[in-house]
Every structure is written in C-alpha cells, then in structure tokens.
Amino acid sequence: MIQRDIEYSGQYSKDVKLAQKRHKDMNKLKYLMTLLINNTLPLPAVYKDHPLQGSWKGYRDAHVEPDWILIYKLTDKLLRFERTGTHAALFG
C-alpha cells in the first residue's frame, strides 16, 4: 500500500467549518476522505472524480453530493485536501 503524507490547506479548514454551519452531512465527506487516504482508487463512480483544468490543473474534483465537491491533489508522496464547497463557491 502506498503511504502518502496528508496535508490540509488553511482554506480547507475554513471550508469544512462553513459546511458544518450549513448542516452538511460531514460523515459523507469523511467517508470520501477515508477512501482517498486508504488509496481506494479509482473512486466509485458515484463520486464523479475527474482532473481539473486551468488554474486548478494538477488537482482533482470529487463529488460528495451533486453540488458539494472536494478538491484535492494526489501525488506519489502526498494527498492534499485543498477546498470543499459548492461549485459556485469554488469556481464561481
């Protein structure tokens, strides 16, 4: 099993607090994060995992819910949780 370092951006922590304030089901986010931490790849199709482009090139986007996404970066040595939120909040 690949062992990666795990990082969380400062903005990610703020995004999580906002999601909690909006009464999002944090267990859904935790489960998706656990899949990534445990290297369960590819992710199940329900997460619609895909690479991002433009200014987010090098990052990936997985759907926690239809309009709740997790942006992360995955390399051989690192898993970085960058942002979470709605499409409008993150890409708008």
Curated annotation (Swiss-Prot):
Coiled-coil stretches: none
Pfam families given in the database record: YafQ_toxin
Entry's EC annotation: 3.1.-.-
Enzyme class: hydrolase
InterPro entries hit by this protein: RelE/ParE_toxin (IPR007712), RelE/ParE_toxin_dom_sf (IPR035093), Toxin_YafQ-like (IPR004386)
Gene disruption phenotype: Cells missing yafQ show increased biofilm sensitivity to the antibiotics cefazolin (a beta-lactam inhibitor) and tobramycin (a protein synthesis inhibitor). There is no difference in antibiotic sensitivity in stationary phase planktonic cells.
Keywords carried by this UniProt record: DNA-binding, Endonuclease, Hydrolase, Nuclease, Repressor, RNA-binding, Toxin-antitoxin system, Transcription, Transcription regulation
Induction: By the DNA damaging agent mitomycin C.
GO biological process: mRNA catabolic process; negative regulation of DNA-templated transcription; regulation of growth; response to antibiotic; single-species biofilm formation; translational termination
Catalytic residue list: H87 (proton donor)
GO function term, MF aspect, one: RNA endonuclease activity, producing 3'-phosphomonoesters
Annotated Gene Ontology cellular component terms: toxin-antitoxin complex
Domain of life where this protein originates: Bacteria
Subunit description: Monomer in the absence of antitoxin. Forms a heterotetramer with antitoxin DinJ, with 2 YafQ-DinJ dimers associated via the N-terminus of the DinJ antitoxins (YafQ-(DinJ)2-YafQ). In this complex the toxin activity is inhibited. Binds the 70S ribosome via the 50S ribosomal subunit.
PANTHER family for this protein: MRNA INTERFERASE TOXIN YAFQ (PTHR40588:SF1)
Role according to the record: Toxic component of a type II toxin-antitoxin (TA) system. A sequence-specific mRNA endoribonuclease that inhibits translation elongation and induces bacterial stasis. Cleavage occurs between the second and third residue of the Lys codon followed by a G or A (5'AAA(G/A)3'), is reading-frame dependent and occurs within the 5' end of most mRNAs. Ribosome-binding confers the sequence specificity and reading frame-dependence. When overexpressed in liquid media YafQ partially inhibits protein synthesis, with a reduction in growth rate and colony growth rate.
NCBIfam families: RelE_StbE, YafQ family addiction module toxin
Similarity comment: family membership: Belongs to the RelE toxin family. YafQ subfamily.
Official protein name in the record: mRNA interferase toxin YafQ
Lineage of source species: Bacteria, Pseudomonadati, Pseudomonadota, Gammaproteobacteria, Enterobacterales
Gene field: yafQ
